[in-house]
Amino acid sequence: LGALTQLLLNLGKL
């Protein structure tokens, strides 16, 4: 667990 959270954070940063 972690990759999904990172992906979500990246999407939010966009």
From Swiss-Prot:
Primary location class: secreted
GO biological process terms on file: defense response to bacterium
Leucine amide: modified positions: 14
Cellular compartment(s): Secreted
GO cellular component: extracellular region
First and last residue of the signal peptide: none
Tissue expression pattern: Expressed by the skin glands.
Protein keywords: Amidation, Amphibian defense peptide, Antibiotic, Antimicrobial, Secreted
UniProt feature coiled coil, ranges: none
Role summary: Antimicrobial peptide.
Family: Belongs to the frog skin active peptide (FSAP) family. Temporin subfamily.
Protein name: Temporin-1LTa
